[in-house]
Amino acid sequence: MNRYFRDMTPARHEKLTRVLAKRQADLTVVLENVFDPHNISAVMRTCDAVGVQEIFILNTKIPRHKKFGARSSSSAAKWLTVHQFEDAEACFSEIKRRYERILTTHLGESSVGLYKIDLTRPTALVFGNEHSGVSDEIRALADGNFLIPQVGIIQSLNISVACAVTLYEAFRQKEQAGHYDRQDLDSAFKQNVWNTWSVNNDSD
């Protein structure tokens, strides 16, 4: 046990242990060219809330993000494993190696409604740029598209809202399937997360 854990209170240790036990290895979020760092931070906070440990941030058209909006995130970024890529092929090669399928948000005729998708399968969920959505290039790499059912006039949601709706549907399905009652992370990755969290144990 390193010195950071020795300095940790029992209550803090119990909390981190409990949270880590709920982290899901078979669900991730991919953000393609999302411009506003506050949107990214809001997505990170939702990822943390539902037990998604990893998030992939792909920047092919905008500068690499150096930091995320602290106001929205409540420092959620430091509790997640954040992968940043500037090359789409490299990003999705890594994702395909680790996840069974890739689904993108897209308002198209071939898209399936969110509530008809089995989100208990290992899945990477892709959300696109605030203005143009997921690019044709990335949709070509995906295994399918989905949409969030709506009955209003405006047929789009803010990226962080769309992600929250989707992740909480995944949470609902995975909780019913008992996924949060099992240890999901492999031992090496789990240890890496522990090591990172031990440095960040001073605050939420």
Put a short name on every predicted segment.
Residues 1-204:
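Post-transcriptional modification and biogenesis factors for structured RNAs
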